Amino acid sequence: MSVLQKPRGVKDWYGEELIYFNWTVHQITNLAWKWGFSEVKTPLLEYAEAFKRTNANADIVKKELYEFHDKSNRLLALRPEATAGIVRLVCENKLLQPQNYPLRLFTIGTMYRYERPQSNRYREHYQFSCEVIGDTNPTVLLDTLLLGHAIIQQLGIEGVILKLNNLGNSATIQQWNQALQAYLTQFKAQLTELSQSRLSTNPLRILDDKVDGQLPFISDAPQIEQFLDAEQQALNTWLQQQLTQQQVPFEWNPTLVRGLDYYTGVVFEFVKDDTTVLAGGVYDNLVEELGGTPTKALGFACGIERSINCLSAVKKQAILANQPPRLLVIGLTEAALEKLLQLSLGWRAYHPVTIYPKVIRIINGIRAAQRLGYRFLGVIGGNNLEQQTITVKDLATEQQTTYTWDEFRQRQVL
């Protein structure tokens, strides 16, 4: 019988990769708590309408959505992103109370997109998502951008640039779309089939296309600044001043758009080389579109796999070096092994203790510890039983120390 394989586009987590994963998640969620965010959990399954109502023209809905009818013929979908689910949670559970504004919520979990698997792009992938619901004033916006910057700094990812644009609002986006449609139609024959289809539905996405976005006539296309009012332009100026003062490397990109249809106002991406590590923006209409009252909101998502891939080799070495020390204990006799089982319950309050499951000689115990990745080896033999002691050997330095059982139980010795 052949070995069962995992589905294409998903990833197993184990060993060092899982250590990097847990470290990355801990760093990000710890910062979210420091910024005043509270954690929520939403289901992997939502009604497909939650995504189709808000992103009808987005690729993640038109091409990449995992959707199916259940046995009751209800159309469900695996979530491709977290924002719609969080907003649905807020609306359904009536969390939109003025005394709660703004809500600061975050979640972390798996997202699903049926796209061609490639480097650091998986059909099942992990995202950290945070949302501020109830206010998007300049201070809230800047504070959220600074959280994104702090995440990049905390992870030690170098060479990251914050790219921003201001889409204004629904009216300015519509005006920009119309102007782009009129301008790009004259170049329709030079566009790919995908971009030609977007001309009538969402021409903004042509600017973001990896192929057509590089065509020479794109640089002369209408830009959003032509349609922004004085207040929106003033926000752009203020943001750039504040980011400069905060020493956040940034670049104002007037052609930047996001792949999700619900974004309005400021959109942004933290980019390393050609990899977007963290991205988001303002979405002032989404809450109303999902059944709530008109409510301003903004948020961003950070890809965990991409973040891990951007960690330097030095950072990864430091993460591994800072893991809690692990101890393998062996019994040289049956009586010693039996005693270890009794003692280990108290010891584990202070030390991660793994018991080797059978009687073994010291030299073989050292080899087993090295093979299994343990730095410390604890030994109990006949003399240790009589003296009620354990000998602990540091395999990295080859130093060894003998402790009484009570000493080893009552204090941190590794």
UniProtKB/Swiss-Prot annotation:
It catalyses: tRNA(His) + L-histidine + ATP = L-histidyl-tRNA(His) + AMP + diphosphate + H(+). Keywords: Aminoacyl-tRNA synthetase, ATP-binding, Cytoplasm, Ligase, Nucleotide-binding, Protein biosynthesis. Its main location: cytoplasm. The keyword Nucleotidyltransferase does not apply. It comes from Mycoplasma pneumoniae (strain ATCC 29342 / M129 / Subtype 1). It holds the Pfam family HGTP_anticodon. GO terms for cellular component: cytoplasm. The keyword Ribonucleoprotein does not apply. This is Histidine--tRNA ligase. One of its GO terms (molecular function) is histidine-tRNA ligase activity. Belongs to the class-II aminoacyl-tRNA synthetase family. Its EC number is 6.1.1.21. It is found in: Cytoplasm. It comes from the Bacteria. Homodimer. GO terms for biological process: histidyl-tRNA aminoacylation.
